[in-house]
Amino acid sequence: MVQIRRGVKEDCPRLLELITELAIYEKAPNEVTVSLEHFTESGFGKNPVWWAFVAEENGIIPGFGLYYIRYSTWKGQRMYLEDIIVTEEARGRGIGKLLMDRLIEEAKEKKFSGMMWQVLEWNEPAINFYKKYYNANFDPEWINCMLSKDQLMQLSR
């Protein structure tokens, strides 16, 4: 039976494996550059910036959901769901829904003003999941912007 629990420091190597698996699925295998040390410190160091729930079954972690707190000047603190990952072989068994339901409970418990996340426009299974179970709003008006570390370093002061 699948149990949902809070992630612990010892889960980090497995979580990073799953993150790499997701990057391959999302056609970006070389984009995962975070080290295990940095990842672990960021979640379990003196000032954690992310939190996770893991799905565990018979000592194996087939999935997890990771979030951080985002601040909106209009709405206050919101949960930002960075990743919800379930291994390909474990999909279709309700693990994603168990994780998402637990994340929703966390958002309620922490009194966040809402939840936000992104989904790739071609990822139909994920889009259908969020529509089917959660009637999520999809906002086509906003465009994601970013600067890479290299771009930041190249910008003059």
Q: Language model features by range: what are they?
A:
Residues K108-Q118:
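Conserved GNAT acetyl-CoA-binding A-motif
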